[in-house]
UniProtKB/Swiss-Prot annotation:
It is found in: Cell inner membrane. Residues 297-362 form the Mop domain. Keywords: ATP-binding, Cell inner membrane, Cell membrane, Membrane, Molybdenum, Nucleotide-binding, Translocase, Transport. It comes from Thiobacillus denitrificans (strain ATCC 25259 / T1). GO terms for molecular function: ABC-type molybdate transporter activity; ATP binding; ATP hydrolysis activity. Part of the ABC transporter complex ModABC involved in molybdenum import. Responsible for energy coupling to the transport system. It catalyses: molybdate(out) + ATP + H2O = molybdate(in) + ADP + phosphate + H(+). This is Molybdenum import ATP-binding protein ModC. The gene is modC. It comes from the Bacteria. SUPFAM superfamilies: MOP-like (SSF50331), P-loop containing nucleoside triphosphate hydrolases (SSF52540). It is a peripheral membrane protein. GO terms for cellular component: plasma membrane. Its EC number is 7.3.2.5.
């Protein structure tokens, strides 16, 4: 991704409905993918609709890359906002081919994407061979890729994506996710991505907003926010951290790669990325155990020195969630309270983190 990330999104809204109130005040990056994450009913889609101008009753302020879309005296209607919107369902026109749907998107834009740029989007999303097909001739994943291309055809300054994979089965999600990762790398505009799926957030997001009961309870860089212990929602088995890492070495005999991050190196399964590839690793708290001294004669490949930062109760009276610092990187470990007591864990305690599984997610 290129371009200046300093041009930000200022979003402040208040909306009162019977039984629900949205009250948010956010400053978001002007580039990259911001995930709006939370349980159903937390206000994610309502916030997205306010940003799109679909909730006229919402009071507030919206500035996108220096442009005022809404304030006390001005309200730019949806059709005049330079944005693209991708819904859970592809919502393509059934009587038009994929090409016709893209051309429709270009016609409704005051400043449509240039033909050469549209060709780039078509290639990026891998839909060139699908352009002459009608929506009923496409799989769910193919329809959604065409819908994303149509949203980009209007040359938006902001792309809104409301759980674009929610209607797809697992196989179709795995089909579409690599294309979304390619968009993440190539797009020069901010993307707001609504999801309640931790794996999607781990793969795609740069910035994370945690929503609950109509409010933004946390907002910050993905890695830092996931490692917070004070989030109002628990991710259950999915709690963990995401770390930026680089493929530093390869062990072809055992089909492994060594990932360098700001805290050391980790062995992971080789997925074919070249040396120097910048990606992400995801480490779940359930896959981290602790010891007071190095352990030998174990099947665990990754053991790193760490320092205890803090700990909190973890939803069940038997469990505790421990935050660690490995070099400059955060790490989470889920332990039984009995184990934490036996290890005499306290802030500042030096331990060894044994990491049973490392997943490359980008």
């Amino acid at each position: 991704m290129s371009g200046a990330g300093e041009a930000a999104i200022r979003a402040r809204f208040r909306l009162d409905w019977p039984g629900f109130a949205l009250d948010v005040d956010l400053d978001l990056p002007g580039q990259g993918v911001t995930a709006l994450f939370g349980h159903s009913g937390s206000g994610k889609t309502t916030l997205l609709r306010c940003i799109a101008g679909l909730e006229r009753a919402a009071e507030g302020e919206l500035r996108v890359r220096g442009e005022v879309w809404q304030d006390a005296t001005r309200f730019v209607p949806t059709h005049r906002r330079p944005l693209g919107y991708v819904f859970q369902e592809a919502s393509l026109f059934p009587h038009l081919s994929a090409r016709g749907n893209l051309e429709y998107g270009m016609k409704r834009s005051r400043e449509p994407l240039a033909r050469a740029a549209l060709d780039d989007v078509v290639g990026l999303l891998g839909i060139g061979r699908l352009l002459d097909r009608r929506p009923e001739q496409l799989s769910g994943g193919e329809r959604q890729r065409v819908a994303i291309a149509r949203a980009l055809a209007v040359k938006p300054r902001l792309l809104l994506m409301d759980e674009p994979l929610a209607a797809l089965d697992f196989a179709r999600k795995q089909e579409v996710l690599p294309y979304l990762e390619r968009l993440h790398d190539e797009l020069d505009i901010p993307v707001l991505y609504v999801s309640h799926a931790p794996d999607e957030v781990a793969r795609l997001a740069d910035h994370l907003v945690v929503m609950q009961d109509g409010r933004a309870h946390a907002s910050g860089p993905l890695g830092d926010t996931l490692a917070r212990l004070d989030l109002p929602i628990r991710l259950g088995e999915d709690v963990g951290v995401v770390l930026d890492a680089v493929v530093a070495a390869r062990d072809p005999a055992w089909h492994l790669v060594e990932m360098a991050f700001a805290g050391g190196r980790l062995w992971a399964r080789d997925n074919g990325q070249p040396l120097g590839h910048r990606g992400r690793v995801r480490i779940l708290a359930r896959d981290v155990s602790l010891s007071r001294a190095p352990v030998s004669g174990t099947s665990i490949l990754n053991t790193l020195p760490a320092v205890v930062v803090d700990s909190v109760d973890d939803g069940h009276p038997a469990l505790v969630l421990v935050k660690l610092r490995v070099g400059d990187s955060p790490l989470l470990a889920r332990l039984t309270r009995r184990s934490a007591h036996a290890l005499e864990l306290a802030p500042g305690r030096q331990v060894y983190a044994q990491i049973k599984a490392v997943a490359l997610v980008g």
